[in-house]
A protein has these predicted regions:
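Short, hydrophobic transmembrane alpha-helix segments
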Residues: 27, 47-57
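Short cytosolic juxtamembrane segments of multi-pass membrane proteins
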Residues: 251-258
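Hydrophobic alpha-helical transmembrane segments of multi-pass membrane transport proteins
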Residues: 39-44, 61-133, 153-154, 158, ...
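Pore- or pathway-lining transmembrane helices of multi-pass membrane proteins that form conduits
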Residues: 31-37, 171-190
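Alpha-helical transmembrane segments and their short interhelical loops
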Residues: 104, 108-179, 226-250
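Membrane-interfacial helix-loop-helix junctions in multi-pass membrane proteins
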Residues: 22, 53-57, 187-244, 257
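Short alpha-helical transmembrane interface motifs in multi-pass membrane proteins
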Residues: 2, 25-28, 63, 74-79, ...
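Aromatic- and glycine-rich beta-strand/loop motifs that create alpha-glucan
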Residues: 1-36
Length: 258
Protein backbone atom coordinates (compact mmCIF):
# COMPACT_ATOMS: atom_id res chain seq x y z
CA UNK A 1 0.00 0.00 0.00
CA UNK A 2 2.78 2.40 0.95
CA UNK A 3 4.64 1.57 -2.27
CA UNK A 4 1.50 2.24 -4.31
CA UNK A 5 0.92 5.63 -2.67
CA UNK A 6 4.58 6.52 -3.15
CA UNK A 7 4.37 5.55 -6.82
CA UNK A 8 1.21 7.61 -7.34
CA UNK A 9 2.82 10.71 -5.80
CA UNK A 10 6.08 10.27 -7.73
CA UNK A 11 4.39 9.65 -11.09
CA UNK A 12 1.97 12.54 -10.55
CA UNK A 13 4.90 14.86 -9.91
CA UNK A 14 6.78 13.62 -13.00
CA UNK A 15 3.75 14.06 -15.25
CA UNK A 16 3.01 17.51 -13.83
CA UNK A 17 6.63 18.49 -14.45
CA UNK A 18 6.32 17.35 -18.07
CA UNK A 19 3.26 19.55 -18.51
CA UNK A 20 5.02 22.49 -16.84
CA UNK A 21 7.92 22.15 -19.27
CA UNK A 22 5.48 22.41 -22.18
CA UNK A 23 4.20 25.65 -20.68
CA UNK A 24 7.69 27.08 -20.26
CA UNK A 25 8.57 26.28 -23.87
CA UNK A 26 5.37 27.83 -25.24
CA UNK A 27 3.83 30.43 -22.89
CA UNK A 28 1.74 32.03 -25.67
CA UNK A 29 -1.45 30.29 -24.50
CA UNK A 30 -1.22 31.81 -21.03
CA UNK A 31 -0.38 35.21 -22.45
CA UNK A 32 -3.48 35.11 -24.65
CA UNK A 33 -5.65 33.87 -21.77
CA UNK A 34 -4.38 36.68 -19.54
CA UNK A 35 -6.15 39.19 -21.78
CA UNK A 36 -9.60 37.96 -20.75
CA UNK A 37 -9.46 38.69 -16.99
CA UNK A 38 -7.82 42.03 -17.69
CA UNK A 39 -10.74 42.97 -19.94
CA UNK A 40 -13.29 41.74 -17.39
CA UNK A 41 -11.76 43.78 -14.58
CA UNK A 42 -10.78 46.80 -16.65
CA UNK A 43 -13.99 47.20 -18.64
CA UNK A 44 -16.83 45.17 -17.12
CA UNK A 45 -15.75 45.75 -13.53
CA UNK A 46 -15.07 49.45 -13.94
CA UNK A 47 -18.36 50.02 -15.78
CA UNK A 48 -20.59 48.24 -13.25
CA UNK A 49 -18.76 49.79 -10.31
CA UNK A 50 -20.38 53.08 -11.33
CA UNK A 51 -23.89 51.66 -11.33
CA UNK A 52 -24.01 50.66 -7.64
CA UNK A 53 -27.08 48.50 -8.24
CA UNK A 54 -25.56 45.20 -7.07
CA UNK A 55 -25.23 44.54 -3.31
CA UNK A 56 -21.57 43.76 -2.63
CA UNK A 57 -21.50 43.06 1.12
CA UNK A 58 -19.77 46.34 1.97
CA UNK A 59 -17.01 46.06 -0.63
CA UNK A 60 -16.53 48.06 -3.80
CA UNK A 61 -17.74 46.24 -6.89
CA UNK A 62 -14.18 45.83 -8.17
CA UNK A 63 -13.21 44.25 -4.85
CA UNK A 64 -16.25 42.00 -4.99
CA UNK A 65 -15.62 40.63 -8.48
CA UNK A 66 -11.82 40.27 -8.28
CA UNK A 67 -12.04 36.81 -6.62
CA UNK A 68 -14.75 35.92 -9.15
CA UNK A 69 -12.62 36.92 -12.13
CA UNK A 70 -9.66 35.05 -10.63
CA UNK A 71 -11.86 31.96 -10.33
CA UNK A 72 -13.11 32.40 -13.89
CA UNK A 73 -9.54 32.54 -15.18
CA UNK A 74 -8.57 29.33 -13.38
CA UNK A 75 -11.71 27.49 -14.49
CA UNK A 76 -11.30 28.54 -18.12
CA UNK A 77 -7.74 27.17 -18.08
CA UNK A 78 -8.73 23.90 -16.39
CA UNK A 79 -11.93 23.16 -18.30
CA UNK A 80 -10.05 22.72 -21.58
CA UNK A 81 -7.54 20.22 -20.21
CA UNK A 82 -9.59 17.41 -21.67
CA UNK A 83 -8.61 18.76 -25.08
CA UNK A 84 -4.97 18.02 -24.27
CA UNK A 85 -5.88 14.39 -23.55
CA UNK A 86 -7.51 14.08 -26.96
CA UNK A 87 -4.45 15.69 -28.55
CA UNK A 88 -2.19 13.26 -26.66
CA UNK A 89 -4.26 10.39 -28.04
CA UNK A 90 -4.02 11.73 -31.58
CA UNK A 91 -0.22 11.94 -31.31
CA UNK A 92 0.09 8.50 -29.70
CA UNK A 93 1.37 9.78 -26.35
CA UNK A 94 -1.71 8.66 -24.43
CA UNK A 95 -1.52 5.10 -25.75
CA UNK A 96 2.10 4.85 -24.58
CA UNK A 97 1.19 6.15 -21.12
CA UNK A 98 -1.68 3.69 -20.75
CA UNK A 99 0.54 0.64 -21.37
CA UNK A 100 3.03 1.69 -18.69
CA UNK A 101 2.59 0.57 -15.05
CA UNK A 102 1.75 4.16 -14.10
CA UNK A 103 -1.41 4.20 -11.91
CA UNK A 104 -4.38 5.77 -13.71
CA UNK A 105 -4.95 8.11 -10.78
CA UNK A 106 -1.41 9.45 -11.25
CA UNK A 107 -2.18 10.29 -14.88
CA UNK A 108 -5.18 12.26 -13.67
CA UNK A 109 -3.41 13.99 -10.80
CA UNK A 110 -0.52 14.95 -13.07
CA UNK A 111 -2.95 16.85 -15.30
CA UNK A 112 -4.72 18.37 -12.29
CA UNK A 113 -1.48 19.64 -10.76
CA UNK A 114 -0.40 21.06 -14.10
CA UNK A 115 -3.73 22.87 -14.46
CA UNK A 116 -3.30 24.23 -10.94
CA UNK A 117 0.14 25.62 -11.81
CA UNK A 118 -1.29 27.31 -14.89
CA UNK A 119 -4.12 28.61 -12.75
CA UNK A 120 -1.66 30.12 -10.29
CA UNK A 121 -0.01 32.09 -13.08
CA UNK A 122 -3.43 33.47 -13.99
CA UNK A 123 -4.06 34.31 -10.33
CA UNK A 124 -0.86 36.35 -10.25
CA UNK A 125 -2.00 38.27 -13.36
CA UNK A 126 -5.43 39.01 -11.86
CA UNK A 127 -4.05 40.14 -8.48
CA UNK A 128 -1.41 42.40 -10.04
CA UNK A 129 -3.92 44.02 -12.40
CA UNK A 130 -6.44 44.46 -9.58
CA UNK A 131 -3.80 46.24 -7.48
CA UNK A 132 -2.97 48.47 -10.46
CA UNK A 133 -6.67 49.43 -10.61
CA UNK A 134 -6.51 50.38 -6.94
CA UNK A 135 -8.42 47.40 -5.57
CA UNK A 136 -7.66 46.90 -1.87
CA UNK A 137 -6.83 43.26 -1.18
CA UNK A 138 -5.75 41.39 1.93
CA UNK A 139 -2.21 40.30 1.10
CA UNK A 140 -0.62 38.19 3.84
CA UNK A 141 1.26 34.91 4.12
CA UNK A 142 -1.90 33.14 5.30
CA UNK A 143 -4.06 34.55 2.51
CA UNK A 144 -1.46 33.71 -0.15
CA UNK A 145 -1.18 30.11 1.07
CA UNK A 146 -4.96 29.84 1.17
CA UNK A 147 -5.31 31.24 -2.35
CA UNK A 148 -2.75 28.73 -3.64
CA UNK A 149 -4.65 25.86 -1.99
CA UNK A 150 -8.04 26.93 -3.34
CA UNK A 151 -6.70 27.56 -6.84
CA UNK A 152 -5.09 24.10 -6.92
CA UNK A 153 -8.27 22.42 -5.63
CA UNK A 154 -10.53 24.38 -7.98
CA UNK A 155 -8.29 23.56 -10.94
CA UNK A 156 -8.41 19.88 -9.93
CA UNK A 157 -12.22 19.89 -9.84
CA UNK A 158 -12.67 21.40 -13.29
CA UNK A 159 -9.78 19.50 -14.86
CA UNK A 160 -11.47 16.31 -13.67
CA UNK A 161 -14.77 17.43 -15.19
CA UNK A 162 -12.95 18.25 -18.43
CA UNK A 163 -11.29 14.83 -18.56
CA UNK A 164 -14.63 13.10 -18.00
CA UNK A 165 -16.14 15.06 -20.90
CA UNK A 166 -13.15 14.19 -23.11
CA UNK A 167 -13.59 10.50 -22.29
CA UNK A 168 -17.19 10.70 -23.50
CA UNK A 169 -16.99 12.88 -26.63
CA UNK A 170 -13.54 11.67 -27.83
CA UNK A 171 -13.08 14.28 -30.61
CA UNK A 172 -11.64 17.80 -30.56
CA UNK A 173 -14.61 19.33 -32.37
CA UNK A 174 -17.21 17.90 -29.99
CA UNK A 175 -15.11 18.77 -26.97
CA UNK A 176 -14.64 22.39 -28.07
CA UNK A 177 -18.37 22.71 -28.64
CA UNK A 178 -19.30 21.33 -25.22
CA UNK A 179 -16.49 23.25 -23.51
CA UNK A 180 -17.80 26.52 -24.88
CA UNK A 181 -21.35 25.62 -23.87
CA UNK A 182 -20.65 24.80 -20.21
CA UNK A 183 -18.03 27.39 -19.23
CA UNK A 184 -20.15 30.53 -19.30
CA UNK A 185 -23.20 28.91 -17.62
CA UNK A 186 -20.90 27.65 -14.85
CA UNK A 187 -19.57 31.17 -14.42
CA UNK A 188 -22.86 33.04 -14.51
CA UNK A 189 -24.65 30.46 -12.32
CA UNK A 190 -22.32 31.27 -9.43
CA UNK A 191 -21.59 34.15 -7.07
CA UNK A 192 -18.62 35.33 -9.13
CA UNK A 193 -20.05 38.67 -10.30
CA UNK A 194 -23.20 39.03 -8.17
CA UNK A 195 -24.40 37.56 -4.86
CA UNK A 196 -26.55 34.45 -4.86
CA UNK A 197 -29.24 36.28 -2.87
CA UNK A 198 -30.35 38.36 -5.88
CA UNK A 199 -30.71 35.36 -8.21
CA UNK A 200 -34.05 33.74 -9.11
CA UNK A 201 -34.93 30.76 -6.92
CA UNK A 202 -34.02 28.07 -9.46
CA UNK A 203 -30.69 29.76 -10.17
CA UNK A 204 -29.88 29.90 -6.45
CA UNK A 205 -30.29 26.12 -6.32
CA UNK A 206 -27.84 25.74 -9.23
CA UNK A 207 -25.37 28.20 -7.67
CA UNK A 208 -25.42 26.34 -4.36
CA UNK A 209 -24.40 23.06 -6.00
CA UNK A 210 -21.90 24.70 -8.35
CA UNK A 211 -18.30 24.06 -7.11
CA UNK A 212 -17.29 27.35 -8.68
CA UNK A 213 -19.36 29.19 -6.04
CA UNK A 214 -17.39 27.58 -3.20
CA UNK A 215 -14.13 28.47 -4.90
CA UNK A 216 -15.27 32.10 -5.13
CA UNK A 217 -16.45 32.06 -1.50
CA UNK A 218 -13.09 30.89 -0.23
CA UNK A 219 -11.11 33.34 -2.34
CA UNK A 220 -13.39 36.22 -1.38
CA UNK A 221 -12.86 35.57 2.33
CA UNK A 222 -9.09 35.27 1.94
CA UNK A 223 -8.63 38.21 -0.41
CA UNK A 224 -11.02 40.72 1.13
CA UNK A 225 -11.14 40.00 4.87
CA UNK A 226 -8.79 39.30 7.75
CA UNK A 227 -10.67 36.19 8.87
CA UNK A 228 -11.14 32.63 7.67
CA UNK A 229 -14.79 32.36 8.74
CA UNK A 230 -16.68 29.77 6.71
CA UNK A 231 -13.70 28.81 4.60
CA UNK A 232 -13.53 25.32 6.12
CA UNK A 233 -16.79 24.28 4.47
CA UNK A 234 -15.67 25.72 1.12
CA UNK A 235 -12.45 23.72 1.32
CA UNK A 236 -14.35 20.57 2.30
CA UNK A 237 -16.64 20.87 -0.73
CA UNK A 238 -13.68 21.42 -3.07
CA UNK A 239 -11.64 18.54 -1.60
CA UNK A 240 -14.54 16.06 -1.78
CA UNK A 241 -15.48 17.16 -5.30
CA UNK A 242 -11.86 16.95 -6.47
CA UNK A 243 -11.54 13.41 -5.07
CA UNK A 244 -14.78 12.31 -6.72
CA UNK A 245 -13.67 13.82 -10.04
CA UNK A 246 -10.28 12.10 -9.67
CA UNK A 247 -11.82 8.66 -9.19
CA UNK A 248 -14.29 9.03 -12.07
CA UNK A 249 -11.61 10.48 -14.38
CA UNK A 250 -9.17 7.66 -13.58
CA UNK A 251 -11.86 5.08 -14.32
CA UNK A 252 -12.87 6.72 -17.61
CA UNK A 253 -9.37 7.73 -18.75
CA UNK A 254 -8.73 4.66 -20.97
CA UNK A 255 -12.07 5.20 -22.73
CA UNK A 256 -10.54 8.14 -24.64
CA UNK A 257 -8.69 5.70 -26.91
CA UNK A 258 -11.60 3.28 -27.39
Amino acid sequence: MFNYISQVITKSYVLAEMEARKLMHDPTELISRAVQPILWLGIFGEALSKVRAIPTQGFTYLQFITPGILTQSVVFVAIFYGLYIIMDRDTGILQKLLVTPTPRIALVWGKMISAGLRGLTMAVVVVIFALILGVKLNISILSILGIILIVMLGAAVFTGLSMIIASIVKTRERFMGIGQVITLPLFFASNAIYPISIMPGWMQVVANINPLSYMVNGLRVLMLTNTTTGIGFDLLVLVVTALVMSVISAWMYPKVVI
